[in-house]
Amino acid sequence: MNIVWDSENYKNDFNFVPDYGESVAELLTVEKGGKVMDLGCGTGALIPTLVNKGYKVTGVDASDNMLEIARKNNPDVEFIKKDASKLDFNNRFDGVFSNAVFHWIDDQNGLLKGINNALKTSGQLVCEFGGKGCAETVHSELERLFAKRGLKYKRTFYFPTIGEYMPLVEKNGFKVTYAVLFDRKTYLKGDLISWINMFDKAPFEGVDEEVADEIKKEAQENLKTVLCEDGKWFVDYVRLRFKGVKVL
């Protein structure tokens, strides 16, 4: 999916994304000195974590806005602009790390095939992304409000179960050594509308701006008793975290 990110807003107001990625990086057991790709590195917030583990890191992202910040914050690290589903590396990396990226990718087979080709034999893929039911309270309410106005709410993301996704990982040459699907109540710095504006823009494309604003405000008002505690908003995230080792 082609997304134009507000990189500064992402870095300042949605830093929970890289914060949660710290624990994902712990699954990576590549030896020190190994080459690791941070796939969908964004602003490069997790690059220091990987560098501190002793890895030679290459950040890969499709967003110019994100890479501009990543390069500024990590001047000694190699960054490459590339679509995650069109990787053309060959036998280059000992590990691939990815946090909060896979659910944005349309071509999952292309994504996993490219990662497999990029890895050396026995190379590790460590990843976390949205799983089945992620932010469902928000998406269901928006879907209802769209339908109320005769509009179709397009779910432009991919939130699979373990049972749906792990066979795909195995089909693309990996042995799955760890997989878990879990709930993560995720608190926001701002309100629900700010979250929608950052992460759920696609369904509103082509919708009259006044109507879009009306839907967002109504959704926030309707969900206030469900997703707001003591004035602090949260979203009902579900995450799928796994580790795979290249065997083919």
Language model: regions and residue ranges:
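A short SAM/SAH-binding and catalytic strip from SAM-dependent methyltransferases
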Residues: G95-Q108
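Class I SAM-dependent methyltransferase SAM/SAH-binding core
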Residues: M37-L39, T43-K86
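C-terminal helical/coil "lid" or tail adjacent to the Rossmann-like core of SAM-dependent
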Residues: T177-D230
